[in-house]
Amino acid sequence: NYNGNPITLGEILQDESEVPEKYFLTDQAKLEKFQYLRGPKKIERTSSDGHQYIYSEGGMSPYDDLNLPGRTMLTSEGTVNRSTHLLFVNNKYRLITPIEAERLQDFPDDWTAKKKLSNGSIVEVSDKMRMFFMGNALVTEIVKEIGYFIRKVEVE
């Protein structure tokens, strides 16, 4: 029984002045691709044995609602696909940044920014890999709450 308040997508956003330009979508073809991917579809397909069927997929909102909690993040976050978080902020479309991805999963800012190599040197992690890390992560607050519950059950 979780009694806390959910964190909305709008609450985890960086100030627009801190968001690098590469996260803003200005390419019309990319925006149209997102529109298609997030829209409803009925596509005739043929299986490997020749059986024809209709693949159907319901539509999603054109962009993520900033007043709702973020959806589940996948390792493909940040690429052009149906599951990527697409934001519409101040009349501009954009993707979430690695810091926002960390916040969405309840990690500290820049948690994934650097890594230690086997030779001991510290190197920067690419934004793509940072998004992959967060798509592969569990929301830390949820894990913590599960741990508290298990401890409580063991004590009783």
Please name every model-derived segment:
Residues 1-156:
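C-terminal target-recognition/interaction regions appended to catalytic cores
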